[in-house]
């Protein structure tokens, strides 16, 4: 059976409700924290490290919730939302691979911001390059990611780490 390699907004909303990978497994956040409209490509092969990659997009409109409050008179998408979107996608990758448990961001290495998303932008593109997937007692993915706005790279993150846990009682 061939794995689905692209996901629509409705697919991602199903994932936020726990319906895509099953109860107790990886979920995306619900809107407003869902920072992705579609995954245009996901693969467990290829990419910069040969371990898999994801490409996803967020459509930008001036009425997105964060522009009204960050900042009044100087609207810009918070950089932390782009970083969170990259963690969301690494967790999605683990669920897509069939690894059980609830996703949790575990950290990252170096993060750089050198651009911004303004209300005049049209599209944000996320590019995730999987470096390593550990399967066993701990299921964990390590990836590098970038965020581009209208084709121009504006953020990078190295060593994004996300794990999936069958119990989060002691987390």
Swiss-Prot record:
One of its GO terms (molecular function) is (3R)-hydroxyacyl-[acyl-carrier-protein] dehydratase activity. One of its GO terms (biological process) is unsaturated fatty acid biosynthetic process. The active site is at 70. It is found in: Cytoplasm. Coiled coil: none annotated. The keyword Cell membrane does not apply. GO terms for cellular component: cytoplasm. Pathway: Lipid metabolism; fatty acid biosynthesis. Its EC number is 4.2.1.59, 5.3.3.14. Keywords: Cytoplasm, Fatty acid biosynthesis, Fatty acid metabolism, Isomerase, Lipid biosynthesis, Lipid metabolism, Lyase. CDD domains: FabA. InterPro entries: FabA, FabA_FabZ, HotDog_dom_sf. It catalyses: a (3R)-hydroxyacyl-[ACP] = a (2E)-enoyl-[ACP] + H2O; (3R)-hydroxydecanoyl-[ACP] = (2E)-decenoyl-[ACP] + H2O; (2E)-decenoyl-[ACP] = (3Z)-decenoyl-[ACP]. The keyword Lipid biosynthesis applies. Its main location: cytoplasm. Necessary for the introduction of cis unsaturation into fatty acids. Catalyzes the dehydration of (3R)-3-hydroxydecanoyl-ACP to E-(2)-decenoyl-ACP and then its isomerization to Z-(3)-decenoyl-ACP. Can catalyze the dehydratase reaction for beta-hydroxyacyl-ACPs with saturated chain lengths up to 16:0, being most active on intermediate chain length. PANTHER family: 3-HYDROXYACYL-[ACYL-CARRIER-PROTEIN] DEHYDRATASE, 3-HYDROXYDECANOYL-[ACYL-CARRIER-PROTEIN] DEHYDRATASE. Homodimer. Belongs to the thioester dehydratase family. FabA subfamily. HAMAP family: FabA. This is 3-hydroxydecanoyl-[acyl-carrier-protein] dehydratase. It comes from Pseudomonas fluorescens (strain SBW25). The lineage of its organism: Bacteria, Pseudomonadati, Pseudomonadota, Gammaproteobacteria, Pseudomonadales.
